[in-house]
């Protein structure tokens, strides 16, 4: 377990999965959640804080190895984060001396394991394919939305809008991503993905994350894109996704969508009283 000693300030760990980077705070045994929206915003500032795409807070949870809460760098909450879940699972498995863990998130109970090749895999649960579950603003088919480019919508505990394009590299990711994120069709805003088919069951994927902007990778986005591609007949259910920060693997099975990929622990530290005061 990371050093959370109060004498040296609140402890944290920096991790990333395929370049999708996180601050992890372990609040187990501390009497409840410690992170606030203000603290998340302060920590998320890459110039004045630590910087991250998402923050993951580990809490005590009866009947599971932990509960897990997610925050975006703008201080908003996120219902799920696939790569952060994999990173925290790696940390917990090392801490507990096991190769499998169970975590509770807003998405529900998730199971993670370490594969024989060393990659960390997590079952992200069944995709949400009904308009009311994602959610969208009104009833419609979710595999072909009434927007320019006819994207798909998939929920993975958070909403995703997926465009299949000829060349993902040519997309104005910042411009189009920001515009689609706040489209009225998505009452809770949305993550935005642009994907190109580059080989059998291989996709090039670029991501604009709700509340974070452009990120090098997105686990739930990889899952949503793989599901959307399979629904359209572009790929099978086992897909390799090549993102700016690395490669993620998705396997859509009957029991849920499995996300696999690398995990890296970067450093540990403690937040100063001055940083805590910014919260």
UniProtKB/Swiss-Prot annotation:
According to the lineage, what is the superkingdom?
Bacteria
Its EC number(s):
5.1.1.7
Active site as annotated: 81, 218
Looking at the UniProt record for this protein, which Gene Ontology cellular component terms does it annotate, in alphabetical order? cytosol
**What's an example of a GO molecular-function annotation for this chain?**
diaminopimelate epimerase activity
Q: Which reaction does it catalyse?
A: (2S,6S)-2,6-diaminopimelate = meso-2,6-diaminopimelate
Q: Any idea where this protein resides?
A: Cytoplasm
Q: Which cysteines are joined by disulfide bonds?
A: none
Locate the site labelled Could be important to modulate the pK values of the two catalytic cysteine residues. 160, 209
Q: Which InterPro entries match?
A: DAP_epimerase_AS, DAP_epimerase_DapF
Q: List keywords of the entry alphabetically.
A: Amino-acid biosynthesis, Cytoplasm, Isomerase, Lysine biosynthesis
**Which residues does substrate bind?**
20, 54, 72, 82-83, 158, 191, 209-210, 219-220
Q: What is its main location?
A: cytoplasm
Q: Name one GO biological process term.
A: lysine biosynthetic process via diaminopimelate
Q: Which PROSITE patterns match?
A: DAP_EPIMERASE
Record family assignment? Belongs to the diaminopimelate epimerase family.
State how it assembles: Homodimer.
**What this chain does, per the record?**
Catalyzes the stereoinversion of LL-2,6-diaminopimelate (L,L-DAP) to meso-diaminopimelate (meso-DAP), a precursor of L-lysine and an essential component of the bacterial peptidoglycan.
Protein name per the record: Diaminopimelate epimerase
According to its UniProt entry, this protein's organism is Cereibacter sphaeroides (strain ATCC 17023 / DSM 158 / JCM 6121 / CCUG 31486 / LMG 2827 / NBRC 12203 / NCIMB 8253 / ATH 2.4.1.) (Rhodobacter sphaeroides)
């Amino acid at each position: 377990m990371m050093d959370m000693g109060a004498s040296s300030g609140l402890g944290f760990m920096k991790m990333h999965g395929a370049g999708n980077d996180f601050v992890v705070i372990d609040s187990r045994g501390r009497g409840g959640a410690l992170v606030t929206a203000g603290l998340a915003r302060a920590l998320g500032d890459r110039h004045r804080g630590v910087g991250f795409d998402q923050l993951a807070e580990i809490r005590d949870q009866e009947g599971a190895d932990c509960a897990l809460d997610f925050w975006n760098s703008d201080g908003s909450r996120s219902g799920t984060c696939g790569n952060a879940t994999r990173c925290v699972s790696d940390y917990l498995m090392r801490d507990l001396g096991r190769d499998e863990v169970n975590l509770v998130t807003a998405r529900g109970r998730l199971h993670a394991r370490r594969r024989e090749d060393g990659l960390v895999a997590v079952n992200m649960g069944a995709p949400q394919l009904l308009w009311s579950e994602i959610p969208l603003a009104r009833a419609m088919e979710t595999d072909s939305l009434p927007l320019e480019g006819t994207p798909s919508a998939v929920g993975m505990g958070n909403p995703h809008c997926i465009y299949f394009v000829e060349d993902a590299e040519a997309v104005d990711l910042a411009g189009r991503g920001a515009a689609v994120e706040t489209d009225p069709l998505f009452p809770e805003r949305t993550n935005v993905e642009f994907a190109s088919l580059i080989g059998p069951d291989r996709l090039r994927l670029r991501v604009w994350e709700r509340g974070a902007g452009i990120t090098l990778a997105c686990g739930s986005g990889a899952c949503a894109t793989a599901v959307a591609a399979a629904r359209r007949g572009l790929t099978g259910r086992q897909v390799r996704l090549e993102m700016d920060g690395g490669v993620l693997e998705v396997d859509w099975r009957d029991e849920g969508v499995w996300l696999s990929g690398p995990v890296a622990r970067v450093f540990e530290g403690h937040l100063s009283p001055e940083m805590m005061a910014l919260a």
